[in-house]
Amino acid sequence: MTKSYSEESMMLESQSSSNWTDKCHSSSQDERDVDKTSEPMLNDMEDDDDAGLNRLEDEDDEEEEEEEEDGDDTKPKRRGPKKKKMTKARMQRFKMRRMKANARERNRMHGLNDALESLRKVVPCYSKTQKLSKIETLRLAKNYIWALSEILRSGKSPDLMSFVQALCKGLSQPTTNLVAGCLQLNPRTFLPEQSQEMPPHMQTASASFSALPYSYQTPGLPSPPYGTMDSSHIFHVKPHAYGSALEPFFDTTLTDCTSPSFDGPLSPPLSVNGNFSFKHEPSSEFEKNYAFTMHYQAAGLAGAQGHAASLYAGSTQRCDIPMENIMSYDGHSHHERVMNAQLNAIFHDS
């Protein structure tokens, strides 16, 4: 009986031990399965945490950018490369670069001024007291080249007046006077716009008395008046006739004074290094004052003016009347009054 009991107990213990080992094996397998399933879950959680952190960082960056944009509304956003720090070497390079640029500009201006000075010596305009400006020099050179090209194209010697008008086209009045003085002409003789502006009764007087000195003075310029002309350099000028004013005082008709004759219009001057040559020069007799030869009989004056007859008993007398006292722009009536006053003073002077 005891043997059987012990055997049964041994069998029960063996069965219980086998069941325990099976349970241990099964529990270990379950733990392994749990570990295998929990690992991806943990990885997923870690990934979610990283994504959340990244998302938070992105949101922070966006907020910072928005704040910067709000701040940029008040100040303009600077573009381009960042400003480098100024060092001594960079400052020295900048200084040398600036000095080289200044030297290049200085040389360029010196060359331009030298070229303009050479051009001033070639164009037909020279003055010791007045120097042409840059724009006037270029305009005069352009007109001079165009006029010479027209002469070469036509092959004929042009009229002096047309040549001077083409030469002075578009120039200012002081430059025109300088050109006229260099060519020994009066600006009033070849400027049609001046004669158009004058009244009709003054145009004839201007044409008759163009031998008067003419000067043009511009305010603001330091140089003396330009283009002062002498009567000895005016061509084709016919003085006013004073014979009709003297006829009432004498028995015979007086002859009018005539100007010396010239060969014709001069050819345009040729400029070679600033020297101008003409075909011929005006006569020296033209430099003298106009002389009025008065022929009268001594017997004709004896009845009315006894003392005047004894004073002017010669056959012919020569009377020189100053031109500055006669020549004016008032018309014929003023000249007649001047002549009457002078003759009365001569005849009644004792």
Swiss-Prot record:
Pfam families: HLH, Neuro_bHLH. Residues 96-148 form the bHLH domain. Residues 7-18 have a biased composition (Low complexity). SUPFAM superfamilies: HLH, helix-loop-helix DNA-binding domain. A motif (Nuclear localization signal) lies at residues 82-88. GO terms for biological process: axon development; camera-type eye photoreceptor cell development; endocrine pancreas development; inner ear receptor cell development; negative regulation of Notch signaling pathway; positive regulation of transcription by RNA polymerase II; posterior lateral line neuromast hair cell differentiation; regeneration. One of its GO terms (molecular function) is DNA-binding transcription factor activity, RNA polymerase II-specific. Changing residue 107 to S: Reduction in ability to induce ectopic expression of isl1. The keyword Cytoplasm applies. It is found in: Cytoplasm; Nucleus. Keywords: Activator, Cytoplasm, Developmental protein, Differentiation, DNA-binding, Neurogenesis, Nucleus, Transcription, Transcription regulation. The keyword Transcription regulation applies. Residues 44-72 have a biased composition (Acidic residues). Residues 22-38 have a biased composition (Basic and acidic residues). GO terms for cellular component: cytoplasm; nucleus. Residues 76-91 have a biased composition (Basic residues). In the embryo, expressed broadly in a subset of primary neurons in the brain and spinal cord. At 28 hours post-fertilization (hpf), regions of expression include telencephalon, olfactory placode, epiphysis, cranial ganglia, acoustic ganglia, Rohon-Beard mechano-sensory neurons and motoneurons. In 2 day postembryonic brain, expressed in many brain regions but absent from subpallium, the ventral preoptic region, ventral thalamus and hypothalamus; sites of expression extend laterally from the ventricular proliferative regions and correspond to freshly determined cell populations. SMART domains: HLH. Residues 1-91 are annotated as: Disordered. May act as a transcriptional activator. Differentiation factor required for neurogenesis. Acts as an upstream activator of isl1. Efficient DNA binding requires dimerization with another bHLH protein. This is Neurogenic differentiation factor 1. It comes from Danio rerio (Zebrafish).
